[in-house]
Structures are given as C-alpha cells and as structure tokens.
Regions:
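Conserved N-terminal phosphate-binding loop of PLP-dependent enzymes in the Aspartate aminotransferase
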Residues: 1-224
C-alpha cells in the first residue's frame, strides 16, 4: 500500500516521469478501471493494450497526462506512426468492449462481488503445506510455493522446477495457472461468478495436493 506512493514521491521530487505499464492491470483487473487508482498514484503515462479489447482484437495505446502532451504538442507535428495505427476493426471492437465494461458494471463486479468472494477462499490456501504466502489484488492473485512455511525458504531444486509440476497438475485438472519460478499466478475472467470461483478453488486445491505428493515422492520437498 505504501510502495507505489513512495515511488511517486521520489519521481516527483527529482522531476522523473512516472510511466505505468497497465497492459495487464488496466480496465478492471485490480477492481478499479486502472491500477493507478487502486494504488493511489497519478502517472504521467499509462500504457494499455489487451484489456482495451478484452483480447478480442490486437490493439494498444498510451494515455498521456496534459503535462507531457502539451510539451509534445508545442513541438509541432510529430512525424512518427505505425503500420497498423487506427485499424478500424480493432478500434470498433475496443469501443464496444468499453461500452460493455461500463454499461454492464464489469469493474464494479470485480470490486464488489468477485474479489471479496475469491479473497477469502484464495487466502485460505495459505494453510496448504506447500504454500508460504498468498496475494490477491482484484482478480490477480499469486501463491508462493515453499518447502518450509515458517521461513518461506526456496526449494533446493532449480527455480521453477516445483512450480512447473504444480502447473502441470493444474492443466490436468482443467485450470489455467501459470508459474513464474515457484510462484503460481491466476487471473480469472473479470465476469467470473461465485459458483465458478468455487470450481476454480476446488481444482486449485486438488492440483496443489497432487503436486505436493509428487514433489515429496521425487525428493524435491527440500529447502535450498
């Protein structure tokens, strides 16, 4: 809660532009339209992409603060462009996607329904013998895998070895969780319903249990 405001303070102090990559976090993922709002900061530039069209069409862009835009505008015409700028189909899909997000209350659903329901169940995974930490912001969560819950030590095996085994059990149980090293990541659909969250958590717990047995049987449940 204090990290990003401190980054903002340092950038402001030294006149550094603050640029946020919101390709993943933009358009409701964190329970607000942008993560900048979630973390209480005001960036100069926000980069956006797949959330703008919910991934249905390739599109990207930047949201620029007046402080930056005015400098560029005063410099005259900017002779730069992209081959696929202003693609009409992608632009139309993005506009329709934004309409749906606003009119159907997708961001509010994440903030008021999906996140609170998921949070209690997600953080309960901290009781699993192979989980050292759980985190969840909006509908973006992670669990840190560890062989020692007390110290949250790393595994002795190469980073990602255990995470990969958990991922494989997830795939086998029809749930998508990516592994970044030995940390598991989820980012369910913004429109996920409580009943679907129940299914997600049932499969996540089953996958962790199965992977835990495999890791122990293969002698990998050892701290580095």
């Amino acid at each position: 809660a204090t990290y990003w405001p401190e980054i903002q303070r340092i950038c402001d102090k030294y006149g550094i532009l603050l640029v946020l990559d919101e390709v993943i976090t933009g358009f409701g993922r964190t329970g607000n339209m942008f993560a900048a709002t979630t973390f209480g900061i005001k960036p100069h530039i926000i980069t956006i992409a797949k959330g703008l069209s919910s991934g249905y069409q390739p599109i990207g862009g930047s949201i620029i603060h007046d402080e930056v835009f005015n400098v560029v505008a005063e410099g005259g015409e900017l002779y730069h462009g992209y081959t696929y700028s202003g693609h009409p189909v992608a632009a139309a899909v993005a506009l329709e996607n934004l309409r749906i997000i606003q009119e159907e209350g997708v961001v509010e659903h994440v903030r008021d329904v999906a996140h609170p329901y998921l949070a209690e169940k997600w953080h309960a995974l901290a009781d699993h013998p192979m989980v050292g930490e759980t985190k969840l912001v909006g509908l973006m969560g992670s669990i840190a895998l560890t062989p020692n819950k007390a110290t949250r030590a790393k595994f002795a095996s190469e980073a990602g070895t255990v995470g990969y085994k958990v991922r494989e059990r997830c795939f086998a149980n029809n749930i998508i969780m990516r592994h970044v090293g030995d940390r598991m990541i989820i980012a369910p659909p913004l429109v996920i319903k409580p009943a679907e969250i129940d299914i997600l958590m049932e499969r996540a717990k089953k996958s962790l249990d199965e992977a835990y047995k495999i890791v122990k049987d293969e002698g990998l449940f050892v701290a580095g």
